[in-house]
Amino acid sequence: LPVSGEIPLPPYFHGELDDPERYQTVFAKTVGSAAAPTAGLHFTPTVVAGLASRGVEIAEVDLEVGLDTFRPMSVDNIEEHHIHRERYEIPQAAAAAVAATRRRRGRVVAVGTTVIRTLETAACGDGLVRAGGGESELFIRPGYQLGVVDAAVTNFHAPRTTLIALVAAMLGSRWREAYAIALERGYRFLSFGDAMFIDQPVNR
């Protein structure tokens, strides 16, 4: 793969990256993902260390982001869309960290839409998650009730994507206001763009 393969960049990228490491997160450890979970690109070793110094515990999960994450929905009725599958692995340490957060009445903050899907797929009641691996085909859209995630960091996404549907599920009608502000202020969208912090989802 390092010799013959190419980085599967999103379709809105043209040409090649000058530095492929720019499309790699500080959390990456194994080969398998077809795309970077781009919300993680906002985190540097300095940012991670700063969070730790403030008492923020970081728990990692293994994600295999699929290429379909970039593809727009081709149906007008969102209920008719068949979402792609993505493989994941939740270590025991991550499941234990979620449980410890619940005991101290803390918040579970997901970094990226794939992490949100993963945690919600592995939900087992009372805001907890099961350790282990599997495939997620969970389609989080308006009306979905979050069972694990209390807040999230995510990029600004393209229209007609399942990523926008997920943001709308978390923010309700406020997502349009948030995106209008982003456009007005010139925030950058997509993989190397800016991020938003969803603090209080409407259904948590």
State where each predicted segment sits:
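Surface-exposed, charge/polar-rich loops and edge strands
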Residues: L1-R204
